[in-house]
Regions:
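Single conserved hydrophobic/aromatic residue that forms the stacking wall/gate
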Residues: 396, 402-405
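Solvent-exposed alpha-helix faces
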Residues: 41, 400-401
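N-terminal-proximal low-complexity accessory segments that begin disordered
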Residues: 2-72, 84-93
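Short Gly/charged-rich anion-binding patches and loops
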Residues: 81
Length: 405
């Protein structure tokens, strides 16, 4: 429990949290500390009793279910009988009528792009940055470092050229399957260039095009000697890096040194299961990292193998479209924030009845306020949205949507 508190409205707020909100969270926002805490005070004393009621409903349901299982211990459970029991106690509800989701301003990473989603503890800034930057990763490195590529020899710190060739072979076969060239294979191509707004693949002095020319979307560098080619498949992008001087391109006729794959399109920054935030100091650490992500200035300095390194958010990736115009692709994973559920309370704030604040309500206020910084820049959500992940909840109640701030 926090040691020092300040009285604000009908609240007792820990020094650490109060200082963070007033001096960091609200900085550069058109919300005064007076307005923020007044709104929070009104909201939490309105919603905390409802939160308590939700928990009591859950406890009553759980007790009835526990008692049923004790009573029927050792008996074969008839599914229809069990469903009837769950319906009678109000746990199961009748299916409602069909409806249409009408949510607006949702980013493509949620509506259009199917891809991996990471979950990362928000308390660890370095892990969080790694996850945010996992939008684009080296396919060569990923394959080389996993057992997708079989190897008779065990792992070694030294580079294995045979394994490296197997990686290149795997990627070329992957491209043959999903981004095929019309009339030939990706194996042993000699060069790539752009002509008449199309990707041209050279092999044995012949020119070839992709079977689906729309999969080529852009490039970087000179059209006759591009440094990167951008391919799109199923709304995910691949960046073919061309650098004949690179070590990885030493035995590649076309000078392809790597393939960068669009990977983790979204990431849940977790305030709940993967962290142990038990007091104001812990919660502020979580909130500060989320604020840094929303402001775009989160950085971490660390030492690895005797070298000092700095990790920060990657910038967007810039290219030239096939029409010759500027093209930018999102350089980072779309970040979602997972709030704590109904059950937990936290000593960061004490309410007027002496109880601890419901942690999920505190999370909702502070994480959404932090996201207002991104609304100005739109570097995370391009549509001006914040994505809050809540644990699975069971409730009879419909909570109000009163604008408290």
């Amino acid at each position: 429990m926090s040691k020092n508190y300040q009285n604000v409205k009908n609240l007792k707020i820990s020094d650490e949290l109060l200082s963070f909100v007033n001096k960091e969270l609200l900085k550069d926002l058109d919300i005064s500390s007076e307005k923020f805490w007044e709104g929070f005070d009104n909201a939490v004393h309105d919603l905390a009793p409802q939160n308590k009621e939700l928990i009591q409903i859950r406890e009553k349901l759980q007790k009835k279910i526990d008692d049923w299982h004790i009573k029927n211990k050792g008996n074969k459970i008839e599914i229809e009988q069990y469903k009837k029991f769950l319906s009678e106690i109000g746990y199961l509800k009748e299916e409602g009528s069909d409806f249409k989701i009408e949510t607006k301003n949702v980013d493509d990473e949620i509506t259009q792009i199917a891809g991996p989603q990471l979950v990362v503890p928000i308390m660890n800034a370095r892990y969080t940055l790694n996850a945010a930057n996992a939008r684009w990763v080296s396919l060569y490195d990923s394959l080389y470092g996993t057992n997708i590529i079989e190897s008779e020899e065990g792992g070694s710190e030294r580079y294995d050229p045979n394994r490296g060739q197997e990686v290149i072979k795997y990627v070329r076969e992957f491209f043959d399957k999903y981004i095929p060239i019309d009339g030939t294979s990706w194996k042993n191509i000699s060069a790539l260039k752009i002509k008449d707004k199309n990707l041209i693949i050279l092999k044995e002095d012949k020119e070839y095009k992709l079977k689906d020319e729309n999969k080529f979307v852009g490039h970087r560098g000179d059209i006759n000697k591009p440094s990167a080619i951008i391919i799109k498949n199923n709304n995910l992008h691949f960046e073919i890096i061309i650098n004949p001087k690179a070590f990885s391109a030493a035995h590649d006729i076309a000078g392809i040194s790597d393939v960068i794959a669009e990977s983790a399109v979204s990431t849940i920054c977790d305030n709940e299961d993967s962290v142990a935030a038990v007091d104001a100091e812990d919660k502020v650490a979580c909130y500060r990292n989320w604020l840094g992500l929303m402001r775009g200035d989160l950085k971490v300095q660390f030492e690895k193998n005797g070298k000092k390194l700095e990790r920060k958010l990657n910038p967007d990736r810039s290219y030239i479209s096939k029409e010759g115009k500027g093209l930018k692709l999102h350089g980072r994973s779309l970040l979602l924030i997972r709030n704590v559920g109904h059950l937990m309370t936290n000593s960061s704030i004490i309410l007027n009845d002496g109880s601890e604040v419901p942690e999920g309500i505190m999370d909702a206020f502070i994480t959404t306020t932090a996201a207002l910084h991104d609304f100005k820049k739109k570097k995370n959500s391009r549509t001006g949205s914040i994505y809050i992940v809540k644990p699975v909840s069971y409730t009879h109640l419909t909570l109000p949507t009163t604008p408290y701030v």
